[in-house]
Amino acid sequence: MASITSNSQILINNDSSTNKAPTTNERQLRRINHPPNLRIVPPLNFCPVENQLYRSGQPSIINQSFLNQLNLKTIIWLSSEEPTDEFLEYCNDSSINIEYLGMINEFNSEPATATTTDKQSQSQSQSQSEEQKSQSQSQSQENQHHQFEQSDNNLLQDPSHLISSTIAKINNNNPWDSLNENTIKHALDLIVDKTNYPILICCGMGRHRTGTVIGCLRRLQHWNLNSVSEEYRRFTGSRGGRILVELLIESFNIDLVNINWELAPDWLK
């Protein structure tokens, strides 16, 4: 009888050992082998700036799940390229207002609110003029880029002309150059109004144009200029920052920004 009891106890012990809870390593392996169906991909160079204020490169379709988590109300679009139809449709379905500031210049000082209807009407009205100007624009863009890089080197050798050269370059209407003062003012007017929040500020790569607006915002927050430059260069990659961008940030007149302190975000007060 004793041997039968001991054998039954062995069988019971074996059964209990096979039904024990999985170890930590087993749980980790199970998570790796079975990833969730929902994949969240942030836009390039995404980073929080302040509470409910974000910056990034130009969002695409694969970033929609991530953007849904932000509950955005406004997107400040600084890129010279217009948003795609798919992205406009997503923003329309999500009730996100796109402020298209990428092409503001001295002749067109008003921002555009991008919608699918607006984009279709613009493409129809501009199709003929774009065909006529496409050849001349493609030739001039290369020359402008070369002059832009050459001017940066000249500024290093002759610091006495820094500010004057900066203003002359900023006022150029070439969309490949840095933003002008008008664009920055419009962007900051939107940022200092908490009724527009949450806000995403974006441009093509989330580097120079976005960095210019953020740098001027930091000046509005009375940051030290060294800290402003360090934050700007953090997003520029291996090529480093542009001298003209940093000079524009330094010379921007923050008194141009219209601040209603009753509607200003708490972090600005």
Curated annotation (Swiss-Prot):
Q: InterPro entries from the entry?
A: Prot-tyrosine_phosphatase-like, Siw14-like, TYR_PHOSPHATASE_DUAL_dom
Q: Which residues form the Tyrosine-protein phosphatase domain?
A: 45-261
Give its localization. Cytoplasm
The catalytic activity, as recorded, is: O-phospho-L-tyrosyl-[protein] + H2O = L-tyrosyl-[protein] + phosphate
Instruction: Name the residues annotated as catalytic in the UniProt entry.
Output: 203
GO terms under biological process = cellular response to oxidative stress
What is the protein name stated in its UniProt record? Putative tyrosine-protein phosphatase OCA1
Protein encoded by which gene: OCA1
